[in-house]
């Protein structure tokens, strides 16, 4: 993952109307993904991780957020079901695609 220290995300005020807003784990998970998504395409071990995507392992994600593995799996499944993320499983993790990344990180 490449995070540019001086980059930022735009968080619209209507985020408080988001269906998962009152679930602290979901908010923390989604904000973690937003803040750690690539701001430009990057090659990593012959895999291109595009803008709006982040490479994570569930174990690392659990350590970083303090959310249990089971709650992470549930949260990711919910975000996928509501079409807010897509993900591709890899041998050592997964690439999470934030579907509306452009809304939060304008060019």
Describe each PLM feature range.
Residues 102-107:
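Short, amphipathic alpha-helical interaction segments positioned at domain boundaries
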Residues 37-97:
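Winged helix-turn-helix DNA-binding recognition segment
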Residues 1-60:
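Short recognition helix of helix-turn-helix/winged-helix DNA-binding domains
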